[in-house]
Amino acid sequence: AKQDADFIRPSPSGFGADGGSFGGIARRSRDVLLLCEAAGFDPILVETVGVGQSETAVAEMTDLFMLLLMPSAGDDLQGIKRGVMELADLILINKADGALEAAAGRTAADYAHALRLMQPRHRAWNAEVLRCSALTGAGIAEICAKVETFGEALRGSGELAAQRRSQAVLWFNRELGLALMDRLAGDADLAQRLKTLERKVAEGAMTPSAAARRILA
């Protein structure tokens, strides 16, 4: 990092008890977030590997979800999954400079219109669309101010604390499922039974729900 107070940590790409990834983030990303928060880092930014319906788990571990997009000719709106937009607290249209400035304005207007047709994610906050330029720095100060306003609004309404409690329970259940799979994979007999049941499911000889009950019997 260029600044002494900054800390940048790439997530591991390996699979297994300490690795793996799902939803655009590594399995232990939330643990790292909690550790960094306890160490006094604020704010903490999480960058995902991309945008897609399956890459939204980051919204389940962060306070604010940003969707970063580029200017388009107006036909890319349909390409963004509705589920991703519904999770966004801020939608940022980058590259709002030079020859793309006008296109960025049109793209921002398109997404602002789409947001008005969606149910707000929070009682105390309506998602907004902002334009910015990483090249010139335009709009960055406004984004930072909006982030602060978002935090104040959700803390004041009590939604931030409630959201964090809900996230903790969600990640407990998710980690429990992964831990059970780790246990199954680590037991030779159970692992063999699991492979047999997977084959039966693939062949259509057994339904997934029946196979799951069988492995737990």
Where do the PLM segments sit?
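Nucleotide-state-sensitive switch-loop elements of NTP-binding domains
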Residues: 1-54, 61-68, 75-76
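Conserved beta-strand segments of the P-loop GTPase G domain that flank and frequently precede/overlap
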Residues: 11-13, 67-70, 92-95, 131-132
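Conserved nucleotide-binding/hydrolysis micro-motifs of P-loop NTPases
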Residues: 17-19, 50-52, 71-75, 96-101, ...
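Residue-level signature of catalytic and energy-coupling elements of molecular machines
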Residues: 29, 47, 84, 94, ...
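Short, acidic/small-residue loops that bind anionic groups at enzyme active sites
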Residues: 67-79, 120, 124
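Canonical P-loop GTPase G-domain recognition
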Residues: 90, 96-153
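Long, well-ordered amphipathic alpha-helical subdomains in the mid-to-C-terminal portions
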Residues: 131, 141-216
